[in-house]
Amino acid sequence: MESIKKILDAVNNRLTGEETEITFEMNPNDVSTKKIDGLLMAGVNRISLGVQSYHDQELKALGRVHDSDSILEAKKILQDTNTTIDLMYGIEKQTLESFTSNLMRFLSSGINHLSLYQLTIEPNTIFYKKELFLPKEKDIERMEAIAKELLEQNGFQQYEVSSWSKPGYESLHNLNYWHFGDFLGVGPGSHSKISNDKKIVRYRKIKPLEGYIKNQKTTDLKTIVEDDLDLDIAMNLLRMKNGHQQRDLSIKLPKSFFEKYEKGISEGLLLKDKIGTTEKGYKFLNETIQLFF
C-alpha cells in the first residue's frame, strides 16, 4: 500500500486537479477493510470491482478465482465507497434467467455505474482452444435487450457501448478515451496515446514485470498518419451513445473523415447535427465503422 501511495503522491504533485478521478481495479476476493481504508487514504476515490457474474458456475467457466460469497463480502466492505462493477454476458452455459438474475443483483447493490461486456474469444487463448457451449446469437441479442430494459427502468443511461451509469456517475477516464483524448500509461503492459492533427502515436510498455524492470523502454510503437486517421477516430468517437459536438473534441477532424461521414448520413447511420450515430447506426456499430476504412 505504501508503494501505491508514493505513486499517487507523485502523480498528484505533477498532473492532477481537484476533480481527478482515481480508480483502482480489484477482484472481489482481494477486497478487505484494511486494503480499502489504505487505498482511500492514498487518494483513490473510485473502486472498479471485477464481479463478472454472481453465479459460481459462470465464474468457474470464466476461470475466476472468486465466488459469490466473496462478492457479497466485498459489497459489505464497499457499501460507502464510490464503486463500479464489471459484468459479462455470453458466458458459457449462461441462460437468459441467470443473466437477468445478475442484473437484478447488481441493481439491488445501489451501485451507480456498470461496465457490461460481451465475452469475446480471442485467438491463442485458453478459451479459444476449448470446445465451448456459448449462448446462441439470438440469446445474446435478447440479453442485450433485457439489459437495456432493466437498466433504463432503474435510472441508468447507456453513455458508451459497454458503459451504463446514473446521471453524474459517468467514468471520467472512459469519457476521455471516447472523446479521443490523449492518455499516458505508466508501468508494465500500460498503453498510451499522444496525438495531434497530423498523426496519432500509440505505444505499449513491456508486459511481464521482470522484463519491464530490466527495460522500461517503449515497445509496440504504432504511428497512425493522416491518411489512416479516419478509422481510428471513428472507432473511438462513435462508441459514445449521445455523440459529440465538434467544438468539444480535442482533435481537428480531417476532410476525408467528413466525406465518409456524409455517406453514413445518407444511409441513415450517422447524425447530421453532431458527430454520432443514429439508433440504427448504434445497433449496427461495426457495420457503421466499416464506412471509414
Enumerate the predicted regions with their spans.
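C-terminal scaffold of the Radical SAM
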Residues: 1-250
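A short, conserved structural fragment
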Residues: 265-274
